[in-house]
Regions:
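Short loop/turn motifs at secondary-structure junctions and domain boundaries
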Residues: 40, 101-107
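Short hydrophobic/aromatic beta-strand element in the GNAT-like acyltransferase core
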Residues: 45, 111, 125
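Regulatory sensory and allosteric helical modules in signal-transduction proteins
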Residues: 51-102
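Short coil/turn motifs at secondary-structure junctions
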Residues: 53, 117, 131-133
Length: 156
């Protein structure tokens, strides 16, 4: 859950980071993941997965290492978001049969799709893990949707 003032601050800082055109795009995305991780205490792990064919490929991230460098569409929370064409907010990952454990400390997860601004086609997603049950809600989703839209403008 993120307060309005902090969400606004995060969106403005995300825009500043992403608009630094003198810095390579991948570095800007890594800097953005670092900022979100550091500024939002409930973001234990935050990263981007890019959709390549029928699998998600890990891009820039900050947090504990993960063995999930590639995730098939339909597997876990990330793959389900693509298969169902919708964002996911999972209050307690331990209740999911289809959960791919990236970290034993993870209790909640949010996935927000990154879509092509013109076609709506899925390009990737922002994936965030939290260590508390119920760490994320619609306020996190709304903030991440704005950030995802800003990312999409840079990669299409």
């Amino acid at each position: 859950m993120v307060e309005d003032a902090l969400a606004t601050e995060a969106i403005l800082e995300a825009e500043t980071i992403l608009e630094a055109s003198d810095i390579p795009l991948q570095e800007r995305l890594q800097n953005l993941m670092q900022y979100l991780h550091d500024r939002l205490p409930h973001f234990h792990w935050v990263g981007i997965y890019w959709l390549k064919g029928n699998e998600l490929v890990l891009g820039p991230y900050v947090g504990p290492p993960t063995e999930h460098m590639r995730i098939p569409v339909g597997r876990g929370v990330c793959g389900t978001a693509v298969a169902e064409n919708m964002n996911q907010i999972i209050e307690d990952v331990r209740e999911l049969e289809n959960y791919l454990a990236c970290n034993l400390e993870t209790r909640s997860e949010i996935v927000v799709l990154i879509r092509c601004p013109k076609s709506g086609r899925i390009l990737g997603q922002i994936d965030v893990d939290g260590t508390e049950v119920g760490a994320f809600d619609e306020s996190d989703e709304a903030m991440l949707e704005v950030i995802a839209e800003r990312i999409a403008r840079l990669v299409v």
